[in-house]
């Protein structure tokens, strides 16, 4: 069993910021678990600028902003495991996670920080009846196709609804 003072589930901007703040407060044993292949979360697909003015004093794109935080995480010696899915958290702070390299991980934590961000859910996950027509996708999926994967999902776009819940 692995032992850490803090396990952060989620390696996006909030997860990295939480880990860095914990390190700044004197916590040495920190592990970030991220299900994507890299740290950075949603920032990786936000190719527009506007990030970093308050924290770094300059305007950065999402990936540039993420890279700065990843650099700080590395400089501070904060451990992380990418491509790792958190499966379960027990009442006594044991985190079960898995990845291709380590298999099943059992991690004892003194504290756990949940910083998993958000994911758009298809209407099936929201219990909305019906089937989705070919080519209908969420805004986040379209953004990922264009900004990360380099695909053009279509030449004509209709946005029916975009909601942000705060």
Question: Residues of each region from the PLM?
Answer:
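Glycine-rich FAD pyrophosphate-binding loop
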Residues: 25-42
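Beta1/beta-strand and adjacent pyrophosphate-binding region of the FAD-binding site
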Residues: 2-14, 156-160
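Feature captures the FAD/FMN-dependent oxidoreductase FAD-binding
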Residues: 64-119
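Aromatic pocket-lining residues of Rossmann-like dinucleotide-binding sites
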Residues: 22
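Phosphate-coordination loops involved in phosphoryl transfer and adenosine-cofactor binding
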Residues: 3-5, 27, 83, 92, ...
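N-terminal glycine-rich dinucleotide-binding loop that anchors FAD/FMN and/or NAD(P) in oxidoreductases
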Residues: 44-81, 134-135, 142
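Glycine-rich beta-alpha-beta "Rossmann" dinucleotide-binding loop(s) and their flanking helix/strand
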Residues: 118-139
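Conserved small/polar residues in nucleotide/adenosyl-binding loops
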Residues: 164-166
């Amino acid at each position: 069993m692995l032992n850490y003072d803090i396990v952060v589930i989620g390696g996006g901007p909030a997860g990295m910021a939480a880990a860095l703040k914990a390190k700044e407060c004197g916590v040495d044993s920190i592990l970030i678990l991220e299900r994507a292949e890299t740290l950075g979360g949603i920032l990786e697909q936000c190719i527009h600028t506007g990030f970093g003015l308050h924290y770094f004093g300059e305007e950065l794109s999402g990936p540039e902003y993420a890279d700065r935080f990843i650099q700080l995480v590395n400089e501070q010696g904060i451990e992380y495991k990418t491509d790792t899915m958190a499966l379960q958290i027990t009442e006594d702070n044991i985190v079960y996670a898995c990845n291709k390299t380590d298999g099943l991980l059992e991690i004892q934590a003194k504290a756990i920080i949940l910083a998993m961000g958000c994911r758009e859910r298809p209407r099936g996950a929201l219990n909305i009846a019906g089937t989705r027509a070919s080519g209908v996708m969420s805004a986040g999926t379209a953004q990922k196709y264009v900004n990360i994967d380099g695909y053009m999902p279509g030449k004509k776009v209709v946005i029916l609804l975009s909601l942000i819940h705060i």
